Every structure is written in structure tokens, then in C-alpha cells.
Amino acid sequence: MARAAVKMPDDFLERIAKLNSHFDDIVPRVLEKGAEPVIQKAKSNLAARIGQGTKEPSQSTGELLASLETTKAVQDAKGDWNLRVGVPTTKDSKGVSNALKAAVLEYGKSGQPPRPWLKPTKSATRKACADAMERALDKEIEKL
């Protein structure tokens, strides 16, 4: 059987070693950069869906739209890094949960058809999110 040996360039191996030692510092910054296009698209989709197709004029206060945010990047028990984009369970000035309002818009309820905003955001921003994370990772690697 034929064998081949490939020797990696020393500078490349040094950068990989540095990346390994700084991995836990780099990943949260990369995930946050990847979340930027998602949050922008989610805000525009949500703004377009609020009050859409209703019989009465919208009485939106803007609190739901303002509550859209990202969580901090955290590492789970398996070692995977996660960052969530969405509406937290905070309540608006009238005491109604923003997450409940977002879920009703997304999935509908009895007598109110669904007006999805989060699922189209996920589909539309998958490539942009990956590209943003790749660019951020390349910048972080260049810094090493």
C-alpha cells in the first residue's frame, strides 16, 4: 500500500495552536457577529407582521419590537456553544408577556391566523449568518 506524508507549514501549525488556546474567547465574538444579520432581519420581519391583516388599526406600542434581542453566547453541557435570537419572557407595560405576543403572531390562535416572522427570518438569514461568522473568524485568526 502506498503512503504519503504531508508536512504542514510551521506558521500554520503555530496559528492553529494559538487558536486552540484562545478558542473560548473567540467563539462568543464570532457568534455575536453571526447574530447581527439575523437580528436585523427579525426586526424587519416582525415590524412588517405587526398589525398585518387585522380588522382594526394596529395599537402597537413598539415594546414587542424593542424587546427582540440576543442572549449571551454560552457553552452547554456537551461543549456546544449557543446564542439565541428572540423575544425574552419580559412583560410589557400592560403586564402581557412579550414572548406570548410573539408566539401568537408566529403561530396564531383561535380566530387569529398565524403571521410567521421568525421562521422566514431563519430561512432567509442562514447564509448571511454563516458568512458573517466566517468573516469574523478569519479576522480573529489574523489577529493571532
Predicted feature residues:
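Short, Lys/Arg-rich flexible segments
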Residues: M1-R84, T89-K94, N98-L144
